[in-house]
Amino acid sequence: MFRRVILSALEDRYNAQISEAAATLKIYLEKPVAIGEHPQHIDEADKLVEKIANAEEKLRILQEFKL
């Protein structure tokens, strides 16, 4: 039971991280003037892509424990 609860909570966390980073990246790509305090748009976008990739990798690894 605890195993399932922990795995589910981790899955929710990683999916939320993906959603948050994807939403922010979408804003950067569609409305870059709205993010005036970040002059390094490419660096910031790269960080967001990295967050998405990391969370997706964690989800992939998590699937191994769900077997």
Regions found by a protein language model. Name each.
Residues 2-67:
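Extended, charge-rich alpha-helical interface modules
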